[in-house]
Amino acid sequence: MTHTPVLLKEMLSLLSPQDGGIYVDATFGAGGYSKAILESADCKVYAIDRDETVTKFYDDLSVRYPDRIKLFIEKFSNIKNLLDSNNIEGIDGIVFDIGVSSMQLDNGDRGFSFLHDGPLDMSMDNSSYINASTFVNALREEEIANTIYNYGGERHSRKIARAIVNARKKKTIKTTFELADIVRSVVFRGKSKIDPATRTFQAIRIWVNDELGELEKGIKAASEILSENGKLIVVTFHSLEDRIVKTFFKDLCATDCKTFSLLNKKVIEASIEEVSANPRSRSAKLRAIQRLS
């Protein structure tokens, strides 16, 4: 499978890696950002990912760039404690590419996608006791409806929640295809190109992994460990994520002490050419700040 990093040129242009610099790729994934940073300068990259299956991508990079990259299997919300405990300092830049990766979506066994049949999991660290099965088989109808509405923007959330509860009364809901069919039984596509199950799956994934809470904690911790002139760059794919980043960056840069400055006043989005080549980039938004002192 080919992994295409989103907004790669724009990220590199803002980060501007320098020889001798120290950078953190807080969402390593398939290593697209890390690889590009290592190619751009004679620098060092510390990579973080909560999904241990990414080690196969790390192994390739560590052979190509010995002693210049190190991977930690950890949630990025723990970035400050992780780097402090390993005596890593002098951070010149931190990049985040938020959301589920293509390799997770394409692996049916992970249960992220309604396009591939598999167990209802959706856990990014592959070891959580809370997963998508917990959500559909254990939560109250009202909790299911509210989550699907709040995290997925699904206006049919109450119908979907009722259908899920009715279905689980007959038998445990076990697979992604079962769940998708339940959603499609009460929400019809009509002329829309978007599958009726899309928003529900997105909402459940966000809930399972506490993605919004992780993002809030992660970018706050990252902002605290940047060196002077260090840059924090975040790419999001969901309006709720972008709102969190936009608000946090605005608040940081609005303080009287002027510790931070916005690197891009206007949000950066993928070009028409990139969207055509990589449809995943369609909803991507990049925001960046720099520590001044």
Curated annotation (Swiss-Prot):
Family: Belongs to the methyltransferase superfamily. RsmH family.
GO biological process, one term: rRNA base methylation
Cellular compartment(s): Cytoplasm
GO molecular function: rRNA (cytosine-N4-)-methyltransferase activity
Described function: Specifically methylates the N4 position of cytidine in position 1402 (C1402) of 16S rRNA.
UniProt-annotated binding residues for S-adenosyl-L-methionine: G31, G32, Y33, D49, F76, D97, Q104
Highest taxon, organism lineage: Bacteria
EC annotation from Swiss-Prot or TrEMBL: 2.1.1.199
Annotated HAMAP family: 16SrRNA_methyltr_H
Reactions this protein catalyses: cytidine(1402) in 16S rRNA + S-adenosyl-L-methionine = N(4)-methylcytidine(1402) in 16S rRNA + S-adenosyl-L-homocysteine + H(+)
Statement: the UniProt record of this protein carries the keyword Transferase: yes
Main location: cytoplasm
Name under which the protein is recorded: Ribosomal RNA small subunit methyltransferase H
GO CC terms in record: cytoplasm
Keywords, comma-separated and alphabetical: Cytoplasm, Methyltransferase, rRNA processing, S-adenosyl-L-methionine, Transferase
InterPro entries: RsmH (IPR002903), SAM-dep_MeTrfase_MraW_recog (IPR023397), SAM-dependent_MTases_sf (IPR029063)
